[in-house]
Amino acid sequence: MQSRKGFTLIELMVVILIVGILASVAIPMMRGRIDSAKWSEGKAIAGSVATAIRVHVAEKGSAFTAVATLSQLGFNAGDLTGTYFAGGESGVGDFAWAITDDDPIAYSITIQAGTGITTPSQIVLSEAGVWTETP
């Protein structure tokens, strides 16, 4: 009698079952990581806006503009547009900012969830550098 080498149907089904279970656990975890990576782009853009706001207030003093335009902050029209977030004037794209005081500087930058991002729905950056997420 010849001995056959290979896997039985049961062994192959067990392997497929194990791979399916691992995939069902790993995929939701990876989606959270993907959203987190996409938010990194928005946070980087918000950081640039925060720096521009501090410069704007330092240059203007008490004559600062509460909702400064892109050009007042030193940006061109497409400078705040990324892969996942649409830039533009405050409140037009995914970003909105407001300056409330010059001494000490007080402002907030709100980012709405961009293209293909599920959670959180928005993140706010305060002048203290604190990020607040809204689910």
Outline where the language-model segments fall:
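N-terminal single-pass transmembrane signal-anchor helix
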Residues: 1-31
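Conserved catalytic core of two-component sensor histidine kinases
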Residues: 16, 43, 50
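Functionally critical, cavity-lining and gating residues within the transmembrane helices
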Residues: 23, 39, 55
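Aliphatic-rich helix starts adjacent to a transmembrane/signal segment
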Residues: 29-47, 60
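Periplasmic/extracellular, small/polar-rich flexible segments of pilin-like filament-forming proteins
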Residues: 51-135
